[in-house]
Curated annotation (Swiss-Prot):
The keyword Phosphoprotein applies. The lineage of its organism: Eukaryota, Metazoa, Chordata, Craniata, Vertebrata. The main inhibitory site appears to be Thr-72. Has over 600-fold higher inhibitory activity when phosphorylated, creating a molecular switch for regulating the phosphorylation status of PPP1CA substrates and smooth muscle contraction. This is Protein phosphatase 1 regulatory subunit 14C. The modification Phosphoserine is found at S25, S33. The gene is Ppp1r14c. Its main location: membrane.
Length: 164
């Protein structure tokens, strides 16, 4: 069973559910400046600057790596919270419909963004009926409730890069 929340990076995995945000630390280790050595005993103020073309290129490359490590993703937390509550409700309802725990549930994929992309309520209901075709219990009430819950929601937009 999976509830898909959006594009590739924000998709809920097999059992985790919910959008995931990954943070990457800058390359270069424990936070010391690249190229500095703690064993030399001299501080940066004491050492003379080296101004060669090769050194400048190396520093520029290290700065690029550092900037790549500092890029963070900013999501609308309120929208993510709504989405998470909805996903938890869906998992609970599917458990009742299929009469089993989440781990034992057949693979049912309900893509919320796909439903929000649909042109009409009828198209959304049709997609949900298709996803729940193997369910032996009546699904009309679940579909009606899910459609009413997503009515005010927006599709999760691709993550925006925060300015550094």
């Amino acid at each position: 069973m999976s509830v898909v929340t959006g594009g590739g990076e924000a998709a809920g995995g097999g059992g985790g559910g919910g959008a995931r945000v990954f943070f990457q630390s800058p390359r270069g280790g424990t936070g010391g400046s690249p190229g500095s050595s703690s064993s030399s005993g001299s501080s940066r103020e004491d050492s003379a600057p080296v101004t060669t073309v090769a050194a400048a290129g190396q520093v520029q490359q290290q700065q690029r790596r550092h900037q790549q490590g500092k890029v963070t993703v900013k999501y609308d937390r309120k929208e993510l919270r709504k989405r998470l509550v909805l996903e938890e409700w869906i998992v609970e309802q599917l458990g009742q419909l299929y009469g089993c725990e989440e781990e034992e549930m057949p693979d049912v994929e309900i893509d919320i963004d796909d439903l929000l992309d649909a042109n009409s309520e009828e198209e959304r209901a049709s997609k949900l009926q298709e996803a729940l075709v193997d369910c032996y219990k009546p699904t009309e009430e679940f579909i009606r409730e899910l459609l009413s819950r997503i009515r005010g929601m927006r599709k999760l937009s691709p993550p925006q890069k925060k300015s550094v």
